[in-house]
């Protein structure tokens, strides 16, 4: 890990002293490798969490650690790359930087929809349509967490729900979930997680 990355991670702890940020930074420092899916997942989650607590510049800096990584055929690794790209897209959309929003979308599409042979592309398109229709939502899990009064699990599932929503937004929205419907839903998830950030631990 080079000094710049270490300085970035240390600056996050100054801006965000909550336990969840300490944990994510520790996880990233422990094994700083882009081939390690746990590290990549921690980078993605850290990026989302920074956006949620209104640290957009830090979120962009964390995203830039992995947003240029090429797809090498391992979707478990690359889903974390497109995860940070969706956060970038959200920030650029807020700032009215439409060209950057388009670039984010194209980067995801090139891998997610157009990688592999025809059969693979057909399957990807099928999955993509289901995701865009909200079939990957975590609303049932969130309800279960509420019933069992498991706040930690509920916060985590709200984060996953947030990430589903910002993915749909980054890809231009859909008939079921146009951008004007997505934005208040994203804001609701953001507010919930921000409110309970001290209790977040995953």
Regions found by a protein language model. Give the residues of each.
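Flexible helix-coil transition and linker loops at the boundaries of alpha-helical arrays
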Residues: 29-37, 69-78, 114-120, 147-152
């Amino acid at each position: 890990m080079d000094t710049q990355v270490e300085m970035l991670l240390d600056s996050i702890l100054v801006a965000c002293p909550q336990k969840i940020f300490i944990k994510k930074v520790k996880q990233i420092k422990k094994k700083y490798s882009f081939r390690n899916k746990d590290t990549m997942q921690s980078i993605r989650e850290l990026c989302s969490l920074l956006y949620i607590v209104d640290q957009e510049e830090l979120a962009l800096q964390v995203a830039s650690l992995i947003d240029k990584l090429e797809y090498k055929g391992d979707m478990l690794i690359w889903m974390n790359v497109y995860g940070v790209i969706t956060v970038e897209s959200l920030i650029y959309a807020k700032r009215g930087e439409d060209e950057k929003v388009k670039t984010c979308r194209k980067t995801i599409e090139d891998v997610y929809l157009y990688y592999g042979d025809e059969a693979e592309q057909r399957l990807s398109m099928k999955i993509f349509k289901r995701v865009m229709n909200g079939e990957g939502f975590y609303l049932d899990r969130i309800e279960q967490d509420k019933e069992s009064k498991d706040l930690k699990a509920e916060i985590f599932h709200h984060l996953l729900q947030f990430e589903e929503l910002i993915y749909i937004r980054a890809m231009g929205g859909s008939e079921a979930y146009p951008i004007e419907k997505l934005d208040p839903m994203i804001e609701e998830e953001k507010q919930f997680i921000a409110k309970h950030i001290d209790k977040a631990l995953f």
